Amino acid sequence: MISVGCAQKPAVPNGNNNHPVSNPSSRLGSPSNNGRPPLPHQQKGPSQTSRIVEVRNTVDDRVLSPSEIFEKNSSAVFKIHTSTGHQGFQGSGFFISSNGVAVSNYHVFQGTAVGYEDIILSDGRTYKVTEVYHKSEENDFIIFKVGINRNVNYVKIADATPKIGEKIYTIGSPRGLDNTFSSGEISQIRENCKILQISAPIDHGSSGGVLLNSKGEAVGITSGGIDDSGANLNYARNIQLIKPYIP
């Protein structure tokens, strides 16, 4: 495997982004013409019967089998339905703490009116976003609180950026298919370690899902792919980008 240095000073959090949106005319993510393809219309996938695991995720430094990685983290990943009030979209997200703090892509919520979002857990229960801690259009992530009053399973964040050639796994809801599990490798690390190019497939609806290492830790937020390239070009945002902003 090729090691790539990723030393960079984290950005200073912007205090203006630490407050929740408080009125119906506000937006969880501000619309802009940034060249990203529009998200697909909201889609209904097959029913999901797995229940949320209401225990704290324990530290485990050993290499896990693919089945163990899925079993450890699947209930921490959820589907997101959003709407501008006129058009619906679908993406993914995942918990990063037991008290309901979660992360997804900024573009999943872009243009979404407050109250027009549904967080659908793997057990089928639906919740709303109660607070936005930070959002970054540039780095395409949003950290928020899901209005859930019990402990939830969550994904442990990895301490470091993975290396080129390392095995990775994804969990998300491509085309609305809840908790789809895929695997691949780190193909390249780009843009000063902000972008992880991966060979695991990322389709519409996978945006905001979790990218995992062989220990079952989050190393990225799955973000997109190049359609019809024939070269399996997919990418994720480095999870290290969110660390300065986690409450």
Question: What are the language-model segments listed below?
Answer:
Residues S3-G5:
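C-terminal motif of bacterial Sec signal peptides marking the signal peptidase cleavage site
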Residues K9-N14, H19, G35-H41, S50-R51, ...:
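C-terminal cap/linker of serine protease catalytic domains
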Residues D61-S67, A76-V101, Y127-K128, G208, ...:
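A conserved glycine-rich beta-strand in the N-terminal activation segment of trypsin-fold
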Residues S83-Q90, S97-G172, G176-T180, C193-Q197:
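Conserved active-site neighborhood of the chymotrypsin/trypsin-like protease fold
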Residues F94-F95, I186, P201-T222:
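Catalytic nucleophile loop of clan PA
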Residues S97, N105-Q110, G172, S182, ...:
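Short beta->alpha transition motifs characteristic of CBS
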Residues E137-D140, H204-G205, G230:
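Short acidic/glycine-enriched loop/turn segments that link adjacent beta-strands
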Residues F181-C193, N234-R237:
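Short, compositionally biased
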